[in-house]
Amino acid sequence: MRSAKPTVADLQAQKGQCQLTNVYVDSIDEAQAASDAGIDIITVQDTLMSSQFRRVAPYAFIVVGIEYGISAVTTDEYLRAGFAALNSGADAVWSAAGLGTISRMRDEGIPVVGHVGLIPARRTWTGGFKAVGRSAASAIEVWKATKALEDAGAFAAEIEVVPEPVASAISKNTSLVMISMGSGSGCDAQYLFSTDILGTNTGHVPRHAKQYADLEAERARIQQLRVEAFAAYVDDVRSGGFPDESRLVSIDDQELSDFRSAIN
C-alpha cells in the first residue's frame, strides 16, 4: 500500500528507471478505482477536479487538463485555472498553450505537462488524426517542440502517436518526463484513456489502445435489468399487486371510524 503521493521531484528522479502508468479518467469512481489499482498518474479534465477527487485518489499524482481554447485562452486565464487546480489538490496541469504561457505558469510555480507529436487541438497543422514524426523532418520538429517545452519550464510532456524509435531517442535526450500515448515503451510513462481500458468507448478505438474489460457490455446488461425491473413495477401496479397489505400502514378501526365521521 502506498503511503504518500509522488511529487514532481519524485517523477523526475524516476526518469529512465521504470515505466510509470498514467490513465485519463472520466469520473470520480474511475479515479478511485485507478488509485486503488496502483496507477501512478491520473489525468482529469479541470471541470471534474475537486477536493473530493483528491480524497478518493490520495496517493496518485494528479494532472488536471486545462483544455486549450475552452477552459482558458489567455495567459491570465491559464494562471487562474492552474492555481484553481492546485488549490483543489492537483499536483500539475496539462497544457497545450503557447510557450510563453507555459513559461509564465512555471515562473509562478505551477508544474506543467506539455504536449508534442499529435496534438488533437492543433491536428490540422500536422495532417489530422494521424502519426507524427514518420519522416526525419517531422521527427526533428517533434524534437524541437520537446526542447522548447523544456526551455519554457515544463517538467513533463505527453508525446502522442510518434514512432517508438523517435520517441525513445527524444526521451533519452531531454530532462522532461516523457509520457507515451501510442509512442512506445522507450519513454518514462505509458498513458491510456479509461474509456479504452474499460471498454466503454463506443466510437473509434485507436490502434495504440488496449482493452482490459468490457464495461460497455456490462452497462448494457445492467440497463436491461433496469428496464425489466421498471416494467415489472408497471405490471405490478396495473394488476393491483402493488402495493400489497404488507407494505401499508395500519390504523385502528375506531380511529378510522372517527376520522371518516369528521370529514363526512
Regions found by a protein language model. Name each.
Residues 1-264:
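Alpha/beta enzyme core
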